[in-house]
């Protein structure tokens, strides 16, 4: 609302800010170059464009900055996801992705809560929303510097400067996770030939391979031709519609009669539930996956349960809670239901990411994550406009937000928006259940094909001692480059 007033944009125009499309090029780049540098550049671009949005004076300027900002974010997410998959074995990837989801959700919650409350103020003489964007820009640039200085891509350790003239010890070549072993089961850094010799014997996958169109077409065809990938993407497309539709929750709470502060804290409570739910779902997927090894059934069953329980809970939230009168009296009830709702419906993302990591050889993981984000983001973004269209043209929403014709109109608008939200959440979730069911038959064979492809190509050197040594050398070299 604050951005809309400042840039003279309607709500429908502001919705286009969330429809900026990004390219899967970032995944193709991340699979061939050091992903830590790709992530650092993405954070830097993200920070600069976020500052540009905060300084925009028209919707056109904001749209251009937002589009470039989306590309910076696209550089970050697929590469970070593939790095997490490389650092963790299959039976702990769900929890690892859950931790990433937890931190992302907590950051988004804190940012949204802060921006909502600072939007009506004028810190340092500027509009509150502009100040919030500039603050995020500063944090993004600092993050870029930290990633550049300290992050290490395990896939590129075989040619990292820390290896030259050093020794490797206790390293194993694995296709799914990191390992270190030596005689007696402990890692060792002695007794092996110099790293340069090891590197010369067998380089990692495409260590210095140039980015050619033939390789791009090959990778794209492999990824898009995987049946389980197609199914998970279809599930993700329809499954992201409810999440985008939930951006209307704040408007819905305000129409119910909650103050701006109460609406913000309720949404923060919902975000906390989602953050913890991601970690819970990933952990449950890992545990059930260990009980059903070498199959996707454990993670898929966890996802199906999350989708299934979300349907009745969404009905309780949108239609079963008291409305009207003094809504402050129902603040605790709404907060409890929103927390449990978020805790229950957020299990799928972490398990889907863990499943993706097993569908392709590890040197194509950035590509598969990038295409997933591209398809889901482009089509799933329709959720927000669908809610508005359904509320206005199907369920009879009248007027504009902030201008109503009295309590009767407000109540009818609440009912219309609640019904639209319910339809745009439950119907996609029904399709999600069907798509997840298909994975029980397709995933195992697709995973077997990925392992066969992985065995045909050289695997990277991996090991925790090597990661630590490379990180130390990277920091030392950066310090040495600084002028005294």
Q: Can you annotate each of these PLM segments?
A:
Residues 155-232, 458-463:
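Juxtamembrane intracellular "pre-TM" segments in multi-pass secondary transporters
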Residues 65-104:
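Cytoplasmic helix-loop-helix junction between adjacent transmembrane helices
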Residues 100-154:
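Helix-loop-helix hairpin linking two adjacent transmembrane segments in secondary transporters
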Residues 130-149, 310, 418-437:
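Symmetry-related core transmembrane helices of the 12-TM Major Facilitator Superfamily/SLC fold
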Residues 16-24, 74, 108-109, 271-279, ...:
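Residue-level signature of mid-helix packing/kink "hotspots" within the transmembrane helices
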Residues 37-51, 297-315:
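Structural signature of the two symmetry-related core transmembrane helices
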Residues 226-279, 345-349, 353, 380-388:
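Extracytoplasmic gate region of multi-pass secondary transporters
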Residues 21-59:
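Conserved MFS/SLC helix-loop-helix module at the cytosolic interface between two early adjacent transmembrane helices
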């Amino acid at each position: 609302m604050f951005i809309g007033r400042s840039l003279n944009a309607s709500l429908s125009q502001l919705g286009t800010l969330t429809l900026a499309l990004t390219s899967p090029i970032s995944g193709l780049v991340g699979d061939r170059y050091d992903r830590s540098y790709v992530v650092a550049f993405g954070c830097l671009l993200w920070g600069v464009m976020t500052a540009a949005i905060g300084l925009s004076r028209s919707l056109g300027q904001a749209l251009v900055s937002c589009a470039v900002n989306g590309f910076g974010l696209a550089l970050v997410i697929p590469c970070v996801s593939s790095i997490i998959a490389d650092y963790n074995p299959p039976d702990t990837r769900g929890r690892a992705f859950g931790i990433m989801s937890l931190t992302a959700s907590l950051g988004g919650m804190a940012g949204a809560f802060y921006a909502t409350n600072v939007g009506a103020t004028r810190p340092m003489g500027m509009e509150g929303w502009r100040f919030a964007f500039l603050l995020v820009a500063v944090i993004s640039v600092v993050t870029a510097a930290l990633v550049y200085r300290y992050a290490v891509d395990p896939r590129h350790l075989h040619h990292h400067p820390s290896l030259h003239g050093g020794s490797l010890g206790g390293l194993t070549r694995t296709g799914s996770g990191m390992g270190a072993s030596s005689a007696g089961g402990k890692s060792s850094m002695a007794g092996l030939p110099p790293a340069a010799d090891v590197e010369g014997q067998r380089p990692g996958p495409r260590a210095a391979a140039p980015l050619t169109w033939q390789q791009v077409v090959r990778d794209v065809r492999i990824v898009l031709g995987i049946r389980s990938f197609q199914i998970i993407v279809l599930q993700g497309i329809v499954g992201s519609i409810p999440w985008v539709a939930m951006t209307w929750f704040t408007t819905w709470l305000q129409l119910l009669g909650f103050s701006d502060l109460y609406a913000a804290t309720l949404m923060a409570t919902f975000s906390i539930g989602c953050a913890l739910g991601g970690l819970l779902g990933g952990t449950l997927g890992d545990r059930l996956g260990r009980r059903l090894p070498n199959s996707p059934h454990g993670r898929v069953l966890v996802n199906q349960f999350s989708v299934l329980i979300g349907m009745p809970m969404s009905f309780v939230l949108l239609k079963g809670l008291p409305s009207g009168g003094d809504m402050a009296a129902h603040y605790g009830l709404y907060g409890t239901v929103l927390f449990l709702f978020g805790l229950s419906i957020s299990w799928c993302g972490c398990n889907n990411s863990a499943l993706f990591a097993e569908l392709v050889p590890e040197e194509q993981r950035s590509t598969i994550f990038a295409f997933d984000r591209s398809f889901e983001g482009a089509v799933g973004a329709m959720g927000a406009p669908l809610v508005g269209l359904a509320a206005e043209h199907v369920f009879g929403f009248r007027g504009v937000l902030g201008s109503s014709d009295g309590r009767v109109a407000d109540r009818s608008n609440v009912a219309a928006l609640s019904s639209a939200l319910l339809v745009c959440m439950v119907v996609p979730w029904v399709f999600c259940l069907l798509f997840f069911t298909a994975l029980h038959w397709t995933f195992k064979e697709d995973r077997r094909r990925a392992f066969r492809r992985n065995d045909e190509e050289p695997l990277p050197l991996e090991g925790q001692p090597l990661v630590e040594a490379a990180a130390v050398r990277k920091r030392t070299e950066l310090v040495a480059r600084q002028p005294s």
